[in-house]
């Protein structure tokens, strides 16, 4: 069992490709449930506290990418161990001071139920602050990616968009994406599973029937694909 400051939580932390922990929570947009996001992608992220400088810049950055995420059938859901009133006051203050409206809901996780289920409170850290966590949940409710940032470091939100693009490409085309991949770049062809298919990968016949095919060796080949 996982512990937080020596206390047993009884919660099993999420794992990649397993069902995301279910939840029902109060937010700045009313009560939300994990099931509300079924059929689309969800980026669930936590921040340490309202009215703090790094978190404020992150919320502005998340607001900036929100239209891009929606075009990818992806929703945003924030979380911290603060009250709804604190969340509302903070997002209103952000808009008043910067002109940036926060369009997505923010969970008020005062009982730490969601934070505990998702492992957002680090052992040895304050139990009233969540770490900078990001969970990507797919349309059938599986955890597909998890990212943890230190308290001092704001997140790169464009990387989150890139991650969504890569996951959606992999699901749609049954391919992998190389380092620093962006939409429009070539993708990686899955490694051959047998000696025979590895040998076939080295033939000109295979190359001729694969659009945009490039080969470094039998295990490292790329091809062009249409956008998802």
Pin down the residues of each PLM region.
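Chalcogenol-based redox active-site neighborhoods
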Residues: 1-228
């Amino acid at each position: 069992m996982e512990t937080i400051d020596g206390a047993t939580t009884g919660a099993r932390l999420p794992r990649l490709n397993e069902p995301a922990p279910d939840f029902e929570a109060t937010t700045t947009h009313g009560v939300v449930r994990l099931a509300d996001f079924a059929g689309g992608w969800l980026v669930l992220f936590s921040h340490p506290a309202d009215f703090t400088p790094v978190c404020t810049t992150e919320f502005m950055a998340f607001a900036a990418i929100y239209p891009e995420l929606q075009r990818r059938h992806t929703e945003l859901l924030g979380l911290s161990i603060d009250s709804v009133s604190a969340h509302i006051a903070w997002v209103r203050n952000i808009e008043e001071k910067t002109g940036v409206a926060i369009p997505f809901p923010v969970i008020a996780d005062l009982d730490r139920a969601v934070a505990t289920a998702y492992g957002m409170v680090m052992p040895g850290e304050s139990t009233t602050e969540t770490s900078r966590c990001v969970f990507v949940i797919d349309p059938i409710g599986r955890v597909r990616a998890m990212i943890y940032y230190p308290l001092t470091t704001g997140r790169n939100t464009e990387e989150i968009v890139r991650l969504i693009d890569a996951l959606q490409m992999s699901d749609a085309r049954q391919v992998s994406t190389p380092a620093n991949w962006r939409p429009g770049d070539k993708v990686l062809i899955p490694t051959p599973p047998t000696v025979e298919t590895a040998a076939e990968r080295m033939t000109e016949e295979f190359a001729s029937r694969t659009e945009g095919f490039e080969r470094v060796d039998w295990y490292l080949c790329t091809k062009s694909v249409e956008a998802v």
